[in-house]
Amino acid sequence: MSSLSLYTVQAVLILDQQGERIYAKYYQPPHRSDEGHQLLFNSVKKQKEFEKQLYRKTHKQDSEILIFEDHLVLYKEYIDITIYLVASLEENEIVLQQGFSAIRGALDLILNSGMDKKNIQENYDMVLLAIDETIDNGVILETDSNTIASRVSKPPTNEPQMALDLDKGFLGAWGFAKSKFQERLQQGL
């Protein structure tokens, strides 16, 4: 058994139908000095080359998991995008699958009109938040897609929303004062 670590994910990628990057986030654990990982993922040119080769390998395949260039890759193809989760070969496939399913499920809930390139680009901020809620610096934090989607889509409820309608308040006070004044006048007569 290799070293145990919470840092399981090396990258999360979303590529379009030409293999071009829509979203890419590479993680590097702070305590590991893995030279191969650093050389592969430190330059944008090498990252894009890796993504192109990965897309060519996985495009129109019937599997959901494969070993590619000493990396374990989980992926899912949709209409015009493919989502990838990249990890080292030593990682637990079941944990990775749960994290990957959480990302996919949360994105399905957030992007209720469909998982396609246009919808992802229109809701890019929500996609980023969902991935960041699931994986932080390579550590899978949450595996429940409903929890992730609720954290991303709900506005914060810390402060109560108080809408002051000054016209209504002023008119209400004026009406109250007017009625009290009329009562006093009637009592005085």
Swiss-Prot record:
InterPro entries: AP_mu_sigma_su (IPR022775), Coatomer_zeta (IPR039652), Longin-like_dom_sf (IPR011012). It is a peripheral membrane protein. One of its GO terms (cellular component) is Golgi membrane. It comes from the Eukaryota. It holds the Pfam family Clat_adaptor_s. CDD domains: Zeta-COP (cd14829). Keywords: Cytoplasm, Cytoplasmic vesicle, ER-Golgi transport, Golgi apparatus, Membrane, Protein transport, Transport. The keyword GTP-binding does not apply. It is found in: Cytoplasm; Golgi apparatus membrane; Cytoplasmic vesicle, COPI-coated vesicle membrane. One of its GO terms (biological process) is intra-Golgi vesicle-mediated transport. Its main location: cytoplasm. Oligomeric complex that consists of at least the alpha, beta, beta', gamma, delta, epsilon and zeta subunits. Belongs to the adaptor complexes small subunit family. The coatomer is a cytosolic protein complex that binds to dilysine motifs and reversibly associates with Golgi non-clathrin-coated vesicles, which further mediate biosynthetic protein transport from the ER, via the Golgi up to the trans Golgi network. Coatomer complex is required for budding from Golgi membranes, and is essential for the retrograde Golgi-to-ER transport of dilysine-tagged proteins. The zeta subunit may be involved in regulating the coat assembly and, hence, the rate of biosynthetic protein transport due to its association-dissociation properties with the coatomer complex. This is Coatomer subunit zeta. It comes from Saccharomyces cerevisiae (strain ATCC 204508 / S288c).
